[in-house]
Amino acid sequence: MESLTLQPINLINGEVNLPGSKSVSNRALLLAALAQGTTRLTNLLDSDDIRHMLNALQQLGVQYQLSADKTECTVEGLGQPFSVKDFTCLYLGNAGTAMRPLAAALCLGQGEFELTGEPRMKERPIGHLVDALRSAGADITYLENEHYPPLKIKGTGLDGGEVSIDGSISSQFLTAFLMAAPLAKSDTTILIKGDLVSKPYIDITLNIMAQFGVQVENQNYQKFIVPAGQVYQSPGEFLVEGDASSASYFLAAGAIKGGEVKVTGIGKNSIQGDIQFADALEAMGAEIEWGEDYIIARHRQLNAIDMDFNHIPDAAMTIATAALFAPGTTSIRNVYNWRVKETDRLHAMATELRKLGAEVEEGDDYITITSPTQLKHVAIDTYDDHRMAMCFSLVALSDTAVTINDPKCTSKTFPDYFTKLEQLSR
């Protein structure tokens, strides 16, 4: 297995222009494909997850032109749901942002489809979404294990009506249903069962739907009303914001070992909830400056915090490694959905932090980290999870080197992450 050893970094300073957001890129690509008109997307993320979505759209008859650097894509909208004559098998790797929304969208049109992916995708639950889609008239069959991909979908249209979705495991189930609902046969009312996790990701979905001309009534995240008969209309141009989850590593680095680090491509008006990571860093003691299209983090002594991170679970992972630099015990609470991500992130994070010498308690939906006085040089296993690799790169901001196993797993969202980190390192 390939590995990368990062030597201790004395100072972090400089500016990073962020790659496009994964969450925004795949939502916008899907809506551009369904929309009337042609959409030019700029600052598109070039990564594995986006490639899986683009390949799927191509198989579904969508025509697009991708620039040489793959960050600009012009999509010819179909102006209607996907319909294919022949049985179509779509391979989606481990891209939840492709699997879940496509599962809902393919119910709308005509044709028979199989949705599958790599082994980890077959361990990531999709039952709550399938239950909701079936209650709206969808014809979906599990091909292997109940409640998990791969799926067989027979497109017959969605009826609409009143539907319940369990929101406690993943907000992507609700996102998927919301994006399909305007094209259902009648108005859809979606009722949320349980506590909805990752609410800011629903805000991203509703914001992008609005940019494509579709309105949804959101009643306090407990009830969503989507009128039928709406049509997605291309906005013409669509700028993909920088990825706020990816910003977290650089902002944390600035807080731990700045100088200062400026990330551009997101700012105080971003539609991504993960910019609230900067507030968590500020709570730990970092100095944060907000601009229209940038955020700056400057070094200050960090302190341990105890916080609920249900709203920003992805960025909360970065707090777990930043906690190594904050004397005391940091508690990251209400993050059960770490367990159903690219890997079981609670278990993976606890295991690797302990290797470094931290004292860790792993609960069902929380983790506490007591920072050690001295970090050990160890090889970090990354579990084929891009965020594990990027989070643990921060260990090099100590006086100890760190070895990252399988560093190329960052290709899921940020293929040149380690190059960018090196450019800021002194």
Curated annotation (Swiss-Prot):
Gene3D superfamilies recorded: Enolpyruvate transferase domain
UniProt-listed Pfam families: EPSP_synthase
A GO term, aspect molecular function: 3-phosphoshikimate 1-carboxyvinyltransferase activity
Catalytic residues identified in the record: 314 (proton acceptor)
Record-linked PROSITE patterns: EPSP_SYNTHASE_1, EPSP_SYNTHASE_2
Entry-linked InterPro entries: Enolpyruvate_Tfrase_dom (IPR001986), Enolpyruvate_Tfrase_sf (IPR036968), EPSP_synthase (IPR006264), EPSP_synthase_CS (IPR023193), RNA3'P_cycl/enolpyr_Trfase_a/b (IPR013792)
BP term (GO), one: chorismate biosynthetic process
E.C. number(s) listed in UniProt: 2.5.1.19
Subcellular location(s) of the protein: Cytoplasm
Coiled coil: none
Reactions the enzyme catalyzes: 3-phosphoshikimate + phosphoenolpyruvate = 5-O-(1-carboxyvinyl)-3-phosphoshikimate + phosphate
Top EC class for this record: transferase
Residues that bind phosphoenolpyruvate: 22, 96, 124, 172, 345, 387, 412
Metabolic or biological pathway, per its Swiss-Prot or TrEMBL entry: Metabolic intermediate biosynthesis; chorismate biosynthesis; chorismate from D-erythrose 4-phosphate and phosphoenolpyruvate: step 6/7
This protein's UniProt keywords: Amino-acid biosynthesis, Aromatic amino acid biosynthesis, Cytoplasm, Transferase
Predominant subcellular localization, coarse grouping: cytoplasm
GO cellular component labels: cytoplasm
Transferase listed as a keyword: yes
UniProt: 3-phosphoshikimate binding residues: 22-23, 27, 170-172, 198, 314, 337, 341
Claim: DNA repair is one of the keywords in the record: no
Subunit structure of this chain's protein: Monomer.
Family according to the record: Belongs to the EPSP synthase family.
Function as written in the Swiss-Prot or TrEMBL entry: Catalyzes the transfer of the enolpyruvyl moiety of phosphoenolpyruvate (PEP) to the 5-hydroxyl of shikimate-3-phosphate (S3P) to produce enolpyruvyl shikimate-3-phosphate and inorganic phosphate.
Name assigned to this protein: 3-phosphoshikimate 1-carboxyvinyltransferase
